[in-house]
């Protein structure tokens, strides 16, 4: 059951987020614009989950490393699934933005 939940929410083996960011990973924060305005990871871009499908053109390189984040990890898990379904090959769920910020 735990493995199943980890797979659904995108949590797997521990990743070195610091290294991914140093190598050019794009952090996509899928919270609302007002949530993002209240605080975010420097260098991240905000594409709310509700408009992600309409804004895929902002993510031109489908082979780029993308780390999704939100407030808790739920929306970023959905975003990861959406991006994978649209052909993005290297997408990671970073979970909540505050925890991700601490990791990088």
Spans of features found by a protein language model:
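Short cysteine clusters
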Residues: 70
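Rhodanese-like catalytic fold shared by cysteine-dependent sulfurtransferases
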Residues: 2-16, 20-25, 33-64, 74-104
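N-terminal glycine-rich beta->alpha transition that marks the start or flank
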Residues: 29
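Short active-site loop at a secondary-structure junction
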Residues: 67
């Amino acid at each position: 059951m735990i493995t199943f939940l980890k797979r659904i929410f995108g949590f797997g083996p521990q990743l070195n987020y610091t290294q991914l960011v140093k190598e050019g990973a794009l952090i996509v924060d899928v919270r609302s614009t007002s949530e993002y305005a209240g605080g975010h990871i420097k260098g991240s871009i905000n594409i709310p989950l509700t408009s992600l499908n309409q804004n895929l053109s902002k993510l031109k390189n489908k082979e780029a490393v993308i780390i999704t984040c939100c407030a808790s990890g739920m929306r970023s898990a959905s975003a990861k699934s959406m991006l994978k379904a649209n052909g993005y090959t290297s997408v990671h769920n970073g979970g909540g933005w505050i925890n991700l910020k601490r990791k990088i």
